[in-house]
Amino acid sequence: MEGFFWKTLLVVGALTISGTSSFPHKPLTYEEAVDLAVSVYNSKSGEDSLYRLLEAVPALKWDALSESNQELNFSVKETVCQMAEERSLEECDFQEAGAVMGCTGYYFFGESPPVLVLTCKSVGNEEEQKQEEGNEEEKEVEKEEKEEDQKDQPKRVKRFKKFFKKLKNSVKKRAKKFFKKPKVIGVTFPF
């Protein structure tokens, strides 16, 4: 009978230990995860100004207890506070014409320690940029036409100059877009 007691005690102890849940990471709500991602962006981006949350896209499938990868999307805007000031973000107002960054973050909770990969890129108003570029091109073309009219050049030379000027402007635009790369930040942190 004594052997039966010890076997029963061993089984009950094993079930008790296996029944308790211990998470390898601290469960995060979506809001906490976004706040942490904004904090990581401010500390790792290398920007002079602090950025504050502008908008967080609600997560439909966020599971605070999940061990799988979790995605979050949000945008941040440049504030009047400088990084060196070490002020709370709540004290910092947005800059009037501050830069807006669209960010996508992925938490990898299955890793030990958990990993956050954050990708942010500028989301300035593309329509305004296109209009400004178009206005600049029109001004340049008008200026060139005036200069060409003043000179007595054959029409063929004028057409070539106009063509190569358009080509040059096109290359400039594409170079600007190419070198406007998003920032990618990866960090690990213990929970």
UniProtKB/Swiss-Prot annotation:
Stored PANTHER family: CATHELICIDIN, NEUTROPHILIC GRANULE PROTEIN
Organism: Naja atra
A biological process term (GO) from this entry: innate immune response
Tissue specificity field: Expressed by the venom gland.
Localization: Secreted; Target cell membrane
GO cellular component: extracellular space; membrane; other organism cell membrane
Propeptide: 23-161
Disulfide bonds: 81-92, 103-120
Function as written in the Swiss-Prot or TrEMBL entry: Potent antimicrobial peptide against most of Gram-negative bacteria, some Gram-positive bacteria (Bacillus) and some fungi. Adopts an amphipathic alpha helical conformation, that may allow to partition into the target membrane. No hemolytic and cytotoxic activities have been observed on mammalian cells.
Regions of compositional bias (Basic and acidic residues) in chain numbering: 140-154
Protein name: Cathelicidin-related antimicrobial peptide Na_CRAMP
UniProt KW keywords: Antibiotic, Antimicrobial, Cleavage on pair of basic residues, Disulfide bond, Fungicide, Membrane, Secreted, Signal, Target cell membrane, Target membrane
SUPFAM superfamilies: Cystatin/monellin
Alphabetized InterPro entries for the sequence: Cathelicidin-like, Cystatin_sf
Span of the signal peptide: 1-22
